[in-house]
Amino acid sequence: MAVVDVHRFAESITCHAWSPDLSMVALCPNNTEVHIYKSLSQDHWERLHVLQKHDQIVSGIDWSSKSNKIVTVSHDRNSYVWSLEGAEWVPTLVILRLNRAALCVQWSPKENKFAVGSGAKTVCICYYEQENNWWVSKLIRKRHESSVTSVAWHPNNVLLATTSTDGKCRVFSTFIKGVDTKDSKAGSPAETKFGEQILQLDLSYSWAFGVKWSPSGNTLAYVGHSSMIYFVDDVGPSPLAQSVAFRDLPLRDVLFISEKMVIGVGYDSNPMVFASDDTGIWSFIRYIGEKKAASSNSSYSSQFSEAFGKFYGSQSKSTTANDASESRGGVHDNCINSIVSLSKAGSPKVMRFSTSGLDGKVAIWDLENMEQELGNQF
């Protein structure tokens, strides 16, 4: 089993992020607060801080690895940057200028900017103005036709990928004069204006979620609500796109383990492994959880029996339903909505990652003992 630690912190978890040294985790227990826990032992976590500033549910958290700052966003349309001063976390309000909820947030690789996706069909690019001692929000208003569900920074700190409930994945330039430095190479992202769309992908016919870049920035992956995952190589005027369909429930988020391997998590409550072969063709490999070994036919039969039993109130059918639900995943009991790397930024391989979900659990997964099982792609 790849799981090394599982702990239930709340009834439900909206999002989570780790401190630079991985000794603390910040999470939202599906309310207006952010709780910070420190691991004292494998089975014991102590709550050190409760960050209270937002008025509505916290929808996004990211913890910078270099500056040790926490950024949070909420349905209240605001963002806070938290700095540790002594033993207290001090918030700085960032006015996003949104008229709808903020849905997700991520620090840029250089941590001089962060991006916020929103329900206002816009993306906020926020940066710090030293002269005025405040955070400024610049809006990318073009193109999006619906809520922006996820954002992902390219390693070059300029390109930003987004997904939306309009089913599209887009790549924008976020170059800001005075914040970003120009690349001497011709055709670099710095030569494009702020907010200019570089690419639009119309691969999904349903909501799109969980966009991520590979460690090198050469490949882009995101998921659709129709149980599809999409891979895009050579992002630019002539991209190469692949679609992989699977028969189980849709995914919500993905993480590149290496250039040729991706972990997907979502409504099936069990991480899924996708890998690329030597010819560059992506495919589904396996589930990480051991208890997914039950045959699909018996699983679907058990689900039908469960629904049939609930309809007629049969007690005997509910026993079969419990057995079926346990076989679908031995770690999480509900949708996994977040997956976070536990490796250093820029690392070519991710050996550890964490997941959190609507069951209130945070699970830590270790892939070191699974290299032979996962194959050469790892």
UniProtKB/Swiss-Prot annotation:
SMART domains the record matches? WD40
UniProt xrefs under SUPFAM superfamilies: WD40 repeat-like
Report disulfide bridges, numbered on this chain: none
GO cellular component terms, A-Z: Arp2/3 protein complex; cytoplasm; nucleus
- Which Pfam family name is an example for this entry? WD40
Say where the protein is mainly found.
Answer: cytoplasm
Tissue distribution is: Expressed at low levels in all tissues with a relatively highest expression in inflorescences.
What stretches of residues are WD repeats?
A: 8-47, 53-92, 97-138, 143-182, 203-242, 257-295, 331-375
**UniProt keyword list:** Actin-binding, Cytoplasm, Cytoskeleton, Repeat, WD repeat
State whether keyword Repeat applies: yes
Q: Which GO terms describe its biological process?
A: actin filament organization; Arp2/3 complex-mediated actin nucleation
Q: What does this protein do?
A: Functions as a component of the Arp2/3 complex which is involved in regulation of actin polymerization and together with an activating nucleation-promoting factor (NPF) mediates the formation of branched actin networks. Arp2/3 complex plays a critical role in the control of cell morphogenesis via the modulation of cell polarity development.
* Assembly notes: Component of the Arp2/3 complex composed of ARP2, ARP3, ARPC1/p41-ARC, ARPC2/p34-ARC, ARPC3/p21-ARC, ARPC4/p20-ARC and ARPC5/p16-ARC.
Spell out the PANTHER family in the cross-references.
Answer: ACTIN-RELATED PROTEIN 2/3 COMPLEX SUBUNIT 1, ACTIN-RELATED PROTEIN 2_3 COMPLEX SUBUNIT
Q: Which family does it belong to?
A: Belongs to the WD repeat ARPC1 family.
Protein known as: Actin-related protein 2/3 complex subunit 1A
The upper taxonomy is: Eukaryota, Viridiplantae, Streptophyta, Embryophyta, Tracheophyta
- Give the gene that encodes this protein: ARPC1A
